[in-house]
Design a protein with these regions (language model features):
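Alpha-helical membrane-protein topology signature
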Residues: 1-165
Length: 165
């Protein structure tokens, strides 16, 4: 029971950071805040025994650092995407449900490395990522994750719509 509480508290902190990241205007700012949240999520997922998600979160930190370096070689981008998939599959202890974080990370990693100067599209891709993680959270008893993912989804939608007007 203590593991569930700690994991849920980590999710609460991570989601607060993600909500905050959706208010940022540049890719560098968005990814910096998301790196902190990825570390917190990875730690929380260990407590909740969602190991494929932990692997995705920790690889995601490296991915974001590389993504903010405009001079990083393209092979490094694709290597990190492949590393995320491989590590997720190795640490998947939940069958199909354990694939959700892998798919989410794959989708968002490709977005980060291929989307240039389109913060709206990056936020939409992040929205898809958060939705997949919300479903995953249901299965690992991360109740805070489900609730706060829903809040982040709403926050992202508001910021995407606000940018339109």
């Amino acid at each position: 029971m203590l593991e569930i509480i700690i994991g849920n508290l980590c999710s609460l902190l991570g989601m607060g950071l993600d909500s905050y990241s959706s208010t940022k205007k540049t890719k560098k700012e968005i990814l910096f805040i998301q790196n902190i949240s990825l570390f917190v999520y990875g730690t929380g997922s260990i407590f909740l025994k969602g190991y494929s998600a932990s692997a995705q979160n920790y690889v995601g930190i490296i991915r974001n650092v590389v993504a903010t370096n405009e001079k990083s070689p393209k092979w490094a981008h694709w290597f990190l995407i492949a590393l995320g998939v491989v590590m997720g599959l190795i640490f998947n202890n939940l069958g199909f449900v354990g694939l959700l974080p892998i798919i989410a990370n794959l989708e968002y990693s490709i977005a980060i490395f291929t989307i240039k100067d389109n913060d709206k599209l990056l936020k939409i891709c992040f929205l898809i990522n958060v939705l997949l993680f919300a479903i995953f959270c249901l299965f690992i008893y991360n109740f805070v994750g489900v609730i706060t993912n829903s809040i982040v989804i709403i926050s992202c939608l508001i910021n995407i719509i606000k940018k339109e007007s």
